[in-house]
A protein has these predicted regions:
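Active-site beta->alpha loop and helix N-cap motifs at the rims of alpha/beta catalytic domains
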Residues: 66, 71-98, 105-108, 112-117, ...
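Active-site cofactor/substrate anionic-group-binding motifs, chiefly glycine-
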Residues: 41-84
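Short hydrophobic/aromatic-enriched beta-strand-loop microsegments
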Residues: 33-41, 71-81, 122-129, 160-169, ...
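Active-site glycine-rich loop that binds ribose-phosphate moieties when present
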Residues: 87-96, 115, 121-136, 143-149, ...
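N-terminal glycine-rich anion-binding loops that anchor highly charged ligand groups
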Residues: 15-24, 28-30
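Redox- and metal-dependent alpha/beta enzyme cores, enriched for Fe-S-associated oxidoreductases
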Residues: 168-208, 212-226
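Single conserved hydrophobic/aromatic residue that forms the stacking wall/gate
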Residues: 227-238
Length: 238
């Protein structure tokens, strides 16, 4: 019996559902019931009927699923899978900011630990961060933990005083302006789609900026060639 058959058999026996992030291997995505970005999978986690949620992703995703559906058992296939950025803010920093600003809302990116979420006022994803921040009554916004997404949001809501944390995604910041310029020279007619976790030096060249699912939709709906700059292989795929 193949591994795939074993997984499907156990899934049925245990009354489990498998959620997989776009970032996991293709083989894992093929046995998953739902594949998507953090926002989509968070919504799915609140609606599934199965007793067990198997979350193929990093730790904060499993934590989020448990927070949203506390009566379900949530299992992580790889307990060591983690997002470094999720730990790049502290409760001490949040408490310090609350002392400095009376009219403050702490906006926590979903890519963060459960502890950080408990000290925040609202949790957002890259899909809805701008909309939520824009509609908050607070003038001062402490955006954690990703400074690049926070900076992107700040530009969309100039009426807010967005205070940035120093966190970042190691993978996204590994994509540099030089890499973009070099690739654009090679493929001058191509479009560039980028995630807002990239640096502003990269985002200024982007034809589209959005969440993982947004980028996929953009690729599907666009007829022109698209640049995909990959790290660490650093090559362009058309």
């Amino acid at each position: 019996m193949s591994v795939t058959s074993d997984i499907l058999k156990l899934k049925k026996e245990k009354n489990a559902v498998i959620l997989a992030h776009y970032y996991v291997d293709e083989d894992v995505q093929e046995v998953a019931d739902y594949v998507g970005d953090s926002f989509y999978l968070s919504k799915v986690a609140t609606k599934v009927d199965q007793d067990i949620i198997v979350f193929a992703g990093v730790e904060f995703m499993g934590e989020s699923a448990k927070i949203l559906n506390p009566k379900k058992k949530v299992l992580m296939p790889e307990p060591g899978a983690d997002c470094p950025m999720a730990h790049m803010a502290t409760k001490e920093e949040i408490l310090k900011m609350r002392e400095q600003y009376d009219d403050l809302a702490v906006v926590c990116y979903i890519n963060s630990t459960a502890e950080l979420k408990t000290y925040s006022d609202v949790c957002v994803t890259s899909s809805n961060a701008v909309k939520i921040v824009k509609n908050l009554p607070n003038k001062n916004i402490f955006f954690i933990p990703d400074q690049n997404l926070g900076r992107f949001v700040a530009k969309q809501v100039p009426e807010k005083n967005v205070i940035l944390n120093k966190g970042f995604c190691p993978r996204h910041v590994a994509i540099t302006e030089d890499m973009v310029v070099e690739t654009k020279k090679k493929y001058p007619q191509a479009k560039l789609a980028a995630h807002p976790e990239c640096t502003e030096e990269v985002l200024k060249y982007a034809d589209y900026i959005g969440s993982t699912s947004g980028i996929i939709d953009y690729v599907v709906d666009t007829d022109l060639s698209l640049i995909h700059i990959s790290e660490p292989t650093r090559h362009a795929q058309i």
